């Protein structure tokens, strides 16, 4: 027996909801669409549903009830009261196929097998307290190991203290220096890893308990790296090997090939790739760059990456690497392309930016019977409508004369913010939802919302209500 689902909706969304359900195909499930006495479905709450929805009214067995994604309130308590399984659907009706698993892979993104080393490149210039604060921020972003970068000809007198402070917080620590004295200090202070040992410094590994990262004498001298690998294997000591990723136009492609060659020749050797030479030295948004580099790392089954966040455009590199390693791991394990797992790395453009065509928005607008402005974005531009009509423009200034809000400062302020968001969404090809911030993926951490509580009225709505009481 197929599952029977009841969809709750409002007046304006009913037609589009029915169309989307039918597009899923008759074999998916049986269903009823119940329109509650509300125009905008997204404004219904759990309390409202409890007052206006009766399961007996459908006259059929109900396996679950799906309410609009923006519905607020305690659906668990509502489900207990009604004796039904109740869940939120997607925010946009066009995403129903995704909700029902038609396109999303539904993989477990908690799985990954690439360690992230996050380097604090100016550690000698920071106090121990500031190093700890930076390290904690990197850990929140997904770093597994905090790398303390040493600077040439710069004293790091508090290196041991910094290592011990991080270890006391249960953080794994690496120290990055070409000076043997720094690496000895790091090892004796309890550092988990030391970067980087060239072949002529292999003997240092015998003096400390830290796991070394091996690099070639010169990036192009892979034979020296293989000799170092052999020496460490004969010692029976753990290590990582790094053939060194070079900047684009300065040996990048050849250096990628060295990682592939190392993996093929030594499938048993743990490998680290430093990504900063590409992310830091390329003027391109790092979400895409990080995705490609982690794609290479996961495909070659590399074991770790070292990333930096020095340049302002690299400020999210640690978080991007964390999302990228999880997405790429899920794609590899499911033997599929890295698509439809997460939108976290789609920071500038959306895969499906405009859920409705201009004709569909016009049909929605024709159903509106109140003066409140609705805003939607389609391929043709910004669509603004209420009971008095629909206007479409690509520049918010073109809409000003049609809005008639010169005497209502609070409402004009609100519409200005929403139209600015809508214009950005149209220009970049992003998803726009009225009263919601634009989704910038991993580039900006949006405050978490508690859908069990009702959203407090915004200051512009409070001002309009206050003004209405005075008139």
Residue ranges and their predicted role:
Residues 81-83, 111-116, 153-185, 207-214, ...:
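Alpha-helix-loop-beta-strand connector modules within alpha/beta enzyme cores
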Residues 43-46, 70-77, 96-98, 103, ...:
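Active-site-adjacent beta->alpha loops and helix N-cap segments on the catalytic face
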Residues 65, 138, 142, 176, ...:
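Conserved, mostly hydrophobic/aromatic
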Residues 86-91, 146-152, 170-179, 183, ...:
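Catalytic beta/alpha-barrel core
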Residues 112-133, 217-221, 278-287:
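Active-site mouth loops of central-metabolism enzymes
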Residues 6-10, 15-16, 20-28, 208-349:
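Catalytic alpha/beta core domains of metabolic enzymes, predominantly
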Residues 45, 126-138, 179, 183-184, ...:
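Short, acidic/polar
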Residues 2-109, 342-471:
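Long, compositionally biased, glycine/small-hydrophobic-enriched stretches that function as flexible linkers
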């Amino acid at each position: 027996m197929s599952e029977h689902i009841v969809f709750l909706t409002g007046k304006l969304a009913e037609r589009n909801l029915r169309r989307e359900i039918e597009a899923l195909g008759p074999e998916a499930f049986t269903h009823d669409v119940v329109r509650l006495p509300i125009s905008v479905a997204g404004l219904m709450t759990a309390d409202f549903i409890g007052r206006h929805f009766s399961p007996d009214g459908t006259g059929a067995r109900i396996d679950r009830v799906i309410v609009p994604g923006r519905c607020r309130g305690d659906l668990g308590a509502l489900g207990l009261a009604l004796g039904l399984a109740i869940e939120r659907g997607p925010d946009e009706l066009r995403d129903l196929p995704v909700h029902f698993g038609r396109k999303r892979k539904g993989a477990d993104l908690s799985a990954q097998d690439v360690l992230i080393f996050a380097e604090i490149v100016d550690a000698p210039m920071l106090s121990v307290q500031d190093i700890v604060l930076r390290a904690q921020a990197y850990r929140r972003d997904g770093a597994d190991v905090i790398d303390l970068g040493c600077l040439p000809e710069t004293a790091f007198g508090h290196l041991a203290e910094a290592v011990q402070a991080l270890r006391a917080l249960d953080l794994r620590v690496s120290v990055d220096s070409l000076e043997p004295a720094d690496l000895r200090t790091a090892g004796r202070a309890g550092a988990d890893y030391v970067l980087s040992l060239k072949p002529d410094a292999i003997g240092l590994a015998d003096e400390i308990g830290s796991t070394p990262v091996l690099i070639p004498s010169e990036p192009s001298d892979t034979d020296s790296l293989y000799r170092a690998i052999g020496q460490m294997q004969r010692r029976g000591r753990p290590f990582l090997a790094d053939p060194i990723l070079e900047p684009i136009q300065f040996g990048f492609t050849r250096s990628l090939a060295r990682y592939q060659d190392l993996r093929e020749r030594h499938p048993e050797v743990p490998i680290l790739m430093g990504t900063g030479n590409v992310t830091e030295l390329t003027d391109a948004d790092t979400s895409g760059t990080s995705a490609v580099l982690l794609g290479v790392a996961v495909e070659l089954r590399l074991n770790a990456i070292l990333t930096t966040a020095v340049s302002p455009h690299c400020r999210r590199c640690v978080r991007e690497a964390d999302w990228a390693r999880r997405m790429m791991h899920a794609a590899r394990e499911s033997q599929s392309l890295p698509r439809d797992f997460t939108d976290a790395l789609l920071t500038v453009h959306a895969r499906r930016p405009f859920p409705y065509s201009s004709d569909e928005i016009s049909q929605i607008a024709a159903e509106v019977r109140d003066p409140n402005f609705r805003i939607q974005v389609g391929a043709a531009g910004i669509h603004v409508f209420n009971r008095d009509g629909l206007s479409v423009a690509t520049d918010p200034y073109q809409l000003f004369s049609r809005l008639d809000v010169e005497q209502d400062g609070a409402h004009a302020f609100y519409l200005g913010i929403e139209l600015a968001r809508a214009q950005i969404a149209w220009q970049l090809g992003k998803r726009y939802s009225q009263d919601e911030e634009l989704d910038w993926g991993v580039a900006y951490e949006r405050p978490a919302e508690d859908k069990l509580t009702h959203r407090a009225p915004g200051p512009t709505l409070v001002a309009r209500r206050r003004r209405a009481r005075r008139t």
